[in-house]
Amino acid sequence: MIIGSHVSMSGRKMFLGSVETSIENGANALMIYTGAPQNTRRKAIEDLRIPEGRALLTEHDFKDVVVHAPYIVNLGNTFKPESFKFAVEFLKEEVKRADALGASQLVLHPGSHVGAGPDAAIASITEGLNQIITPEQNVKIALETMAGKGTEVATNFEQIQQIITGVEHNEKLSVCFDTCHTNDAGYDVKNHFDDVMDEFDQIIGLQKIGVIHLNDSKNEMGSHKDRHENLGFGTIGFKALHYIANFDKFQNVPKILETPWVKDPDAKKHSPYQLELAMLKSGRFDDTLIEKIINN
């Protein structure tokens, strides 16, 4: 199983620190943002401590590195040309950072139509990706399945395929399948995951799935809410998520946890990833996990 979580890349250690944290968590893959996900301020590539981090990855036989683009870039905004242009230029540089980090996937929230309608946003996203993607890049841009919150697009497989079809170098595109998002978008990943995969395969092709975001959901299927929950404590449940993590066609696909940190009574937050990864590997749900995370 190729499994890991989102880890921070910050401070003096930058990427080296991300790798160290992932090793402590018992992971063999990791996902990072190249800076804060809520903004686009980024350090120079030479300041990210990539060589030391890559050396440690090799030493510990890590299988994959995934980068996530910040939430705030929106290729789907047709009302503000300056926002579209900024998103294109930022993502061109983000591809360079992801390649320097040796990432296989650059996860991207495709965008929101902000009132213009899905078709207009999809056309804009396609145009933007055609400006960003080059045949020379190594990293694939992984279009994330979205929950349908607000005016998000890519909330169904057909919309994602529309984008892929419109991109010239779509061999450089993949899909990030988020279990919480697809549940909230209305796909029954809990009870009928095989059927969901058959539908995905018919519309897009399973070979396009480059990374799985393995998250439980706080909300019911079809809620369009996008609120992640710790594994086994949401509406999808541990049994289904463990099945997805071990799905035979995903053996070489990284599974990344983005589950929420747990607050103790003093409102201090605790990382869940070490214990969640251990639980996932064991295959046994622990209903005392939240308490253990707080006391870990």
Swiss-Prot record:
Q: What is its EC number?
A: 3.1.21.2
Which residues does the record give as Zn(2+) 1 binding sites? 68, 109, 144
Disulfide-bonded cysteines: none
Q: Name one GO biological process term.
A: base-excision repair
GO MF terms, alphabetically ordered: deoxyribonuclease IV (phage-T4-induced) activity; DNA binding; DNA-(apurinic or apyrimidinic site) endonuclease activity; phosphoric diester hydrolase activity; zinc ion binding
Give the matching SMART domains. AP2Ec
- Annotated SUPFAM superfamilies: Xylose isomerase-like
The UniProt record lists the keyword Ligase: no
Give start-end ranges for the coiled-coil region(s).
none
How, per the record, is the cofactor bound?
Answer: Binds 3 Zn(2+) ions.
Q: Which reaction does it catalyse?
A: Endonucleolytic cleavage to 5'-phosphooligonucleotide end-products
Pfam family name, one: AP_endonuc_2
Enumerate the cofactors the protein uses.
Answer: Zn(2+)
Q: Which residues bind Zn(2+) 3?
A: 181, 226, 228
Keyword DNA repair tagged: yes
Residues involved in Zn(2+) 2 binding: 144, 178, 213, 258
What is the uppermost EC class here?
hydrolase
Q: What is the role of the protein in this entry?
A: Endonuclease IV plays a role in DNA repair. It cleaves phosphodiester bonds at apurinic or apyrimidinic (AP) sites, generating a 3'-hydroxyl group and a 5'-terminal sugar phosphate.
Q: Which family does it belong to?
A: Belongs to the AP endonuclease 2 family.
Q: What is this protein called?
A: Probable endonuclease 4
Lineage in the entry?
A: Bacteria, Bacillati, Bacillota, Bacilli, Lactobacillales
The encoding gene is: nfo
